[in-house]
């Protein structure tokens, strides 16, 4: 018995980006033919799993992506899409306490530059939109992180807020859902998504990372 939830979208890289959410339930039944009850009580293999040394590791992640942007339309409560595609670059440095083989948690320093941040509709500009200077499009934030660790894959969530920013779009409470795919023992690919206020789509986080001071025992 189980349940599955899925969200499909284009990651705010194109318009429209309405998204699709699905939820389903699963029920399964298994019957084993000709299995003897005494075989279940026997252990045929005795894997040696060393004790886990609890420790603090440090994840450094660099990411980038592209996005579309909708800005407030003057004189109405609606929004209009800005022309073009805008770049996003960022980093994350996260000291993580490793509790065991399956879970780690910690805090992260998050930095981002979003070329679409704080754009405004402006009839004085040639394309009809005003883009502020770079200092209004950068931010530093702090987030709490938790990660479920599996062989080759790690699924993580983060909740944070920007503490140094240029105001406007960058003054936000953000959420992160990320997948890390091991490439080597300490390096990984990073695929994530950033939300604002739990419902506003923000940007993809496609990047690479490296884990320092990794004392996790090698099992495979």
Model segments located where?
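Outer-membrane beta-barrel translocator/channel fold
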Residues: 2-4, 11-16, 117, 190-220
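Solvent-exposed loop/turn segments connecting transmembrane beta-strands
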Residues: 12-15, 19-20, 83-85, 99-101, ...
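Outer-membrane beta-barrel "beta-signal"
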Residues: 21-42, 201-220
